């Protein structure tokens, strides 16, 4: 167990705790001696996951059912946290969903679903847990955003839009709650292996091709994201608030949206346009990428 982060004994709540990224963040908190509040939709599974975490790391972990879009469930989770732990020091918002569609075909129901989970859910959880932090005069909020909140990702417009909203929400919380001792920051991943992106990397050639587009020449792991979250969740980052930290292997500094990204959204875009008789690179971009030559 490392003491450098000084997280030992802190109470750290994580939404979307049963997802690949959320689970690893919970485990990393536990490795550093923090007590963990796991929040997710499946009550039975989240309670079992918390019990396993407690047994493995010897910390206090609890799992509570929580839909971040439901104010009553969020408040119940806050009340349970205060009842069982006495306080909350950290909230990490990882809960999120993704829908692929060209904007002209995106159903309003999909738009509303993604907005509700990714943006409204982040707001409600931050507001309710944040009130307890304001009372205590200290607290740290960390929100999982994406590099696509800066650069458009074709056919993931609603996802990118919500995450851009999360970035601004984080800045507003940082500005308004800073005087109360509460900090708010975002982590912006890209090209990371998670259950949500598993289908992208099922083909080894896709992973190999995508790796060539990244400065570090490898696809990210959930541990890469968890490590960045640990820093922002700790008092080691006490002078950092309202920030967005890119954790993307340098991709966002190297490439724009017209870079070919084999598999996943790019393949979806290429196939969609191909069916309409349009070649993405010659007819739309007017270029051929190195991988096409």
What does each model-found stretch correspond to?
Residues 4-37:
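Canonical Rossmann dinucleotide-binding motif of NAD(H)/NADP(H)-dependent dehydrogenases/reductases
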Residues 98, 106, 152-160, 172, ...:
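Active-site loop-to-helix junction immediately N-terminal to the catalytic Tyr of the SDR YXXXK motif
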Residues 102-103, 110-115, 210:
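Substrate-binding pocket helix/loop in short-chain dehydrogenase/reductase
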Residues 126, 162, 170:
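Active-site helix of classical SDR
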Residues 131, 175-179, 238:
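Alpha-helical segment proximal to the catalytic Tyr-Lys
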Residues 146:
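Residue(s) in the substrate-gating loop at a strand-loop-helix junction
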Residues 186, 208-240, 245-249, 276-293:
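C-terminal helical subdomain
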